[in-house]
């Protein structure tokens, strides 16, 4: 599971760069629309679940994404899972010492009735997280 930096939308989504001819706009007001992607990769089934939020990358957004993923599973799939294992980078919004994140995860464990195991990669090693290979589709 991982969240990425803000993704701009519209004419400025790639810093204004394009591979083809593009007619320039009359005025350059910049892009005000942006979204924050948060993704979850199920390694057993190779299914990618991506949510886009319009707010900041926070611990609440991460837990809300995980909750939406769980609710989207069928009852049979939920029953087949004995524990949820999350491989995460050690970012500030999902750190194991951040009380808001741990409190929300505790409530989620109580809600779903399954243990959640948080596995953190050391600093500067998030490239080994399998979800990192999926972010190229946003470019």
Where do the protein language model's features map onto the residues?
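RNase H-like two-metal-ion nuclease catalytic core shared by retroviral integrases
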Residues: 96, 119-139
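Short, surface-exposed basic-aromatic patches at helix termini and helix-loop junctions that form
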Residues: 100-114
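Residue-level recognition of the N-termini of beta-strands and the immediately preceding loop/turn
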Residues: 80-84, 114-119
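Divalent cation-coordinating acidic motifs and surrounding scaffolds
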Residues: 11-15, 23
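Active-site- or DNA-interface-adjacent structural scaffold in DNA-acting proteins
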Residues: 1-12
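Short, conserved catalytic/metal-binding motifs centered on acidic residues
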Residues: 1-2, 46, 89, 129
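Electropositive, glycine- and tryptophan-enriched low-complexity nucleic-acid-binding patches
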Residues: 23-87, 92
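Short secondary-structure boundary/capping segments
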Residues: 14-18, 100-103, 134-138
């Amino acid at each position: 599971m991982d969240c990425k930096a803000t993704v701009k939308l519209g004419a400025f989504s790639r810093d204004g760069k394009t591979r083809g001819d593009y007619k320039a706009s009359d005025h350059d007001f910049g892009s005000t629309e942006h979204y924050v992607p948060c993704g979850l990769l199920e390694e057993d089934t190779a299914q990618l679940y991506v949510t886009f939020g319009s707010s900041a990358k926070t611990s609440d957004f991460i837990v809300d994404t995980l909750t939406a993923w769980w609710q989207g599973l069928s009852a049979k799939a939920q029953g087949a899972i004995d524990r949820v294992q999350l491989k995460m980078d050690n970012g500030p919004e999902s750190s194991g010492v951040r009380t808001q994140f741990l409190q929300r995860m505790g409530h989620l464990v109580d809600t779903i009735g399954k243990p959640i195991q948080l596995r953190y990669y050391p600093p500067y090693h998030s490239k080994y997280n399998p979800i990192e290979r999926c972010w190229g589709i946003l470019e």
